[in-house]
């Protein structure tokens, strides 16, 4: 515990020095940083557009770009038009929403806990969603994605509330350390309960394992419609909290001296993370790695300023999830590899390389 507390304090001090150095930089240096941030955001936007086009064009049947544009803007009911508009556009839309939500949630959770290795799963979102989906299958006979969405979202919300309540026990309210400990405890309990249910019922296990792998396949536009308002609400709350999160990253005492309510800021952050990660998990199943590594990638050009880091993380998360989905369609064509598997296979080694090469900017 002492070692972890020392690590968090050291990370907070490093971040504070970085922010103060940036604020004290000469005008030309600040102007150069702003240009680099704008260039980075523009590059991410271009990559996201390219990923969207690739997601629509690539699949068991490849569709040329002129066919993609024809289906998007002047459809005539051809086979390619039906494939694009009925199958690949909803899948791409959901990938953008879910990837952006996970990237943004990852940046928020790392900022609120001051833990560079935190991801949305720290609040028990994935395990809460999984447990409620298993209960929905086992106790209520839910067998379709539309039913999974609401059970998963309810589970993610319940787990986050439990973590926040447990982490708030005591005079100091929720702190990075208490939230991390509460999240680990709640996640372990929910994982054990989920395993107990699937082990005693084979049919529940068969239905659950297809959802648990994490995928964009088979999701229709109605799935995105079910979660879009939760995603938008979470994004608005998260983006609006950027100035307060900058102050909070300098330490709770500094944030209070600057006029911010630490408890309110952290509470709103948990609400935003729950809405974002819970909705994405409900729609696509548990998807790892995106919320963990995306903030580290974009910090290379945004720096520690959350006014830039949060929108950049959303763009990068959407692009990363779509590109992983495209790779999954290509490597085992005409079949496909689920996006959750692709991210686990590619993302784990990449993150290790990122840390080893010291490309991860201190939070």
Regions found by a protein language model. Give the residues of each.
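Alpha-helical transmembrane segments in inner-membrane proteins
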Residues: 4-363
């Amino acid at each position: 515990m002492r070692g972890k507390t020392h690590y968090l304090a050291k990370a907070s001090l490093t971040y504070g020095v970085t922010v103060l150095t940036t604020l004290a930089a000469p005008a030309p240096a600040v102007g150069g940083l702003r240009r680099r941030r704008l260039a980075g955001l523009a590059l991410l936007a271009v990559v996201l557009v390219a990923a969207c086009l690739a997601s629509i064009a690539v699949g068991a049947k490849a569709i040329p770009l002129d066919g993609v544009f024809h289906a998007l803007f002047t459809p005539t009911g051809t086979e390619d038009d039906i494939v694009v508009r009925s199958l690949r556009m909803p899948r791409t839309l959901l990938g953008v929403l879910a990837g952006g939500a996970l990237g943004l949630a990852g940046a928020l959770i790392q900022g609120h806990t001051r833990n560079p290795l935190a991801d949305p799963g720290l609040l028990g979102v994935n395990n809460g969603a999984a447990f409620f989906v298993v209960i929905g299958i086992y106790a209520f006979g839910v067998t379709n994605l539309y039913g999974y969405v609401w059970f998963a979202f309810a589970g993610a919300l319940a787990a986050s509330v439990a973590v926040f309540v447990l982490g708030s026990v005591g005079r100091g309210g929720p702190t990075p350390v208490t939230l991390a400990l509460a999240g680990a405890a709640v996640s372990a309990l929910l994982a054990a309960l989920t395993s107990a249910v699937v082990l005693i019922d084979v049919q529940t296990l068969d239905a659950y394992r297809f959802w648990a792998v994490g995928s964009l396949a088979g999701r229709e536009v109605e799935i995105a419609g079910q979660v879009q308002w939760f995603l938008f609400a979470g994004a608005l709350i998260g983006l609006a909290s950027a100035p307060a999160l900058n102050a909070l990253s300098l330490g709770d005492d500094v944030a209070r001296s600057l006029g911010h309510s630490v408890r309110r800021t952290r509470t709103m952050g948990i609400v935003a993370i729950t809405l974002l990660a819970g909705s994405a998990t409900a729609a696509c199943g548990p998807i790892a790695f995106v919320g963990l590594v995306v903030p580290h990638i974009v910090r290379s050009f945004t720096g520690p300023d959350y006014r830039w880091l949060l929108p950049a993380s959303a763009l990068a998360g959407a692009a990363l999830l779509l590109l992983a989905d495209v790779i999954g369609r290509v490597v085992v064509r005409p079949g496909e590899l689920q996006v959750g598997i692709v991210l686990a296979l590619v993302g784990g080694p990449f993150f290790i390389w990122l840390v080893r090469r010291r490309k991860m900017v201190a939070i």
